[in-house]
Swiss-Prot record:
Source lineage: Eukaryota, Sar, Stramenopiles, Oomycota, Peronosporales
Pfam families in alphabetical order: RXLR
Position of the signal peptide: 1-23
Descriptive protein name: RxLR effector protein PITG_18609
Domain topic, free-text comment: The RxLR-dEER motif acts to carry the protein into the host cell cytoplasm through binding to cell surface phosphatidylinositol-3-phosphate.
Natural source organism: Phytophthora infestans (strain T30-4)
Length: 149
């Protein structure tokens, strides 16, 4: 019985395919040939009827307000983070304030060293290592002050 069903399906499929091919062969395609080809060199550009913008905000302003752009002076490039960080860490008041904030927040020296050791940049690693060593010295100094009191 299964073989009979399979053969009937094959015959029906062939009959449908043959009927569609013969129907397509009888159609008149001369109208498609009679149309003239479009010459793209002679097309006229039309203006847009509306001035819809793709963005909701002005390009000159960002999400939080106006965006300022200060171009670098000739021959002068913006310093990388390493240079900025070393400059900021050369100020002892800022470094001590940073150590004080870490100390008040309860960060251990091991945690600070671990968090600062995640950079793959060689210059930053050296700077962060120096910073971690400085924090360790700061914590030891604080602990010795507390023991004296």
């Amino acid at each position: 019985m299964r073989m009979h069903s399979v053969l009937m399906m094959v015959v029906a499929t062939l009959a449908i395919a043959n009927g569609s091919v013969s129907a397509a062969g009888g159609s008149n395609l001369r109208k498609a040939k009679a149309t003239s080809s479009i010459n793209s060199f002679n097309t006229v550009q039309t203006e847009a009827k509306n001035s819809r913008m793709l963005r909701n905000t002005d390009v000159a302003t960002g999400e939080n307000g106006h965006v300022y752009y200060y171009p670098a002076k000739k021959g002068e490039r913006k310093p990388f983070i390493e240079v900025r960080l070393k400059k900021a860490l050369s100020n002892s008041k800022k470094v001590n304030r940073l150590y004080e904030d870490w100390y008040k927040s309860g960060f251990s020296t091991k945690k600070v060293a671990k968090e600062l050791n995640q950079s793959e940049n060689r210059e930053l690693k050296e700077t962060y290592k120096t910073l971690a060593i400085g924090y360790t010295a700061f914590v030891k100094g604080k602990q010795s002050q507390q023991q004296l009191q």
